[in-house]
Regions:
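Glycine-rich, acidic loop regions that bind phosphate or pyrophosphate groups
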Residues: 1-54
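Non-catalytic alpha-helical coupling and interface elements of nucleotide-dependent molecular machines
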Residues: 40-44, 92, 248
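Short coil/turn segments at secondary-structure boundaries
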Residues: 50-54, 100-101, 253-254
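Domain-wide signal for the mature, well-folded portions of proteins, strongly enriched
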Residues: 48-54, 88, 112, 210
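A diffuse structural propensity rather than consistent per-protein peaks
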Residues: 46-48, 79, 215, 232
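Active-site diphosphate/adenylate-binding microenvironment
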Residues: 59-134, 139-140, 145
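Thiamine diphosphate
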Residues: 3, 19-20, 26-28, 32-38, ...
Length: 255
């Protein structure tokens, strides 16, 4: 599209500063109101019929790609996409996915294709580490009859996890999936990709003398939740089914 000389991009944002994008016509305002105004301004104009057909074909191709990349796998260490895919396949349309920060955000955002409104919450603007569990608790309080699933890396989990206890004692059940990759892996990757050296992001390469492995399932149990460690995508799917049946907060950890 950017190669098309007639291509026009419209950028809508409530902030005048953020509405300014390269090669875009800036519109400052609420997205819903602005779209209605733009639609009214267009009158009877509509995109060619083959444009809709093209968009559906592209969407189907994208969904097929996602299903393939996030599908069942026997590889020793599953990817974030595999983890998100396993939970998505076993979830119900009303289940709400919550994530923030790290590599999980990008993968969950792509794999979790909402089947109902308001079933995907991502804190991405500030990559707010540890929003996952506390945010999930707030969402559960607002949606007590729905399953709320928090996807969280071990780094964010270690920074803030006490709302597991809060969820238990207030009877606001959460399902928490902990992806244990041994530290702040995305920041470590950024350091390396920018030409730097590892610096205290992955635990095993940090300057420590007494490194200990953490049993996140046992830690969750100490806060009153049910905890379970799994080692494969198929085990994760089975654990998630058990978590769905549980009456209280359930934490599943996978490396």
């Amino acid at each position: 599209n950017f190669e098309n000389p007639n291509f026009k991009l419209v950028s809508i944002n409530v902030s005048r500063f953020d509405a300014n994008k390269h090669m875009a016509e800036s519109v400052v305002g609420d997205a819903k109101v602005s779209l209605l105004d733009i639609s009214n301004a267009l009158g009877n104009w509509k995109a060619p019929d083959d444009w809709y057909k093209k968009s559906r074909e592209a969407l189907n191709s994208w969904n097929n790609y996602l299903d393939k990349e996030s599908g069942p796998t026997n590889q020793k260490l599953p990817s974030y996409a595999h983890v998100a895919g396993a939970i998505y396949r076993k979830s119900d349309p009303s289940d709400i996915a919550v994530t923030a920060a790290g590599g999980l955000v990008g993968e969950v955002l792509q794999v979790w294709r909402p089947r109902e409104l308001n079933t995907h919450e991502t804190e991405w603007g500030f990559s707010c580490m540890s929003y996952e569990i506390s945010g999930a608790l707030g969402i559960k309080m607002a949606n007590p009859k729905k399953e709320v699933i928090a996807f969280v890396g071990d780094g964010s989990y270690l920074l803030y996890n006490s709302d597991i206890y809060s969820s238990v004692i207030t009877n606001h059940k959460l399902i928490i999936v902990v992806c244990d990759n041994g530290g702040h892996a995305v920041i470590n990757r950024l350091q390396l990709y920018k030409g730097g050296k590892e610096f205290n992001c992955l635990f095993e390469s940090s300057k420590v003398d007494n490194l200990k492995n953490i049993d996140f399932a046992k830690h969750a149990e100490s806060l009153g939740a049910t905890g379970e460690n799994v080692s494969s995508v198929s085990d994760l799917e089975a654990a998630f089914v058990r978590a769905k049946k549980s009456k209280s907060t359930y934490v599943i950890s996978i490396k």
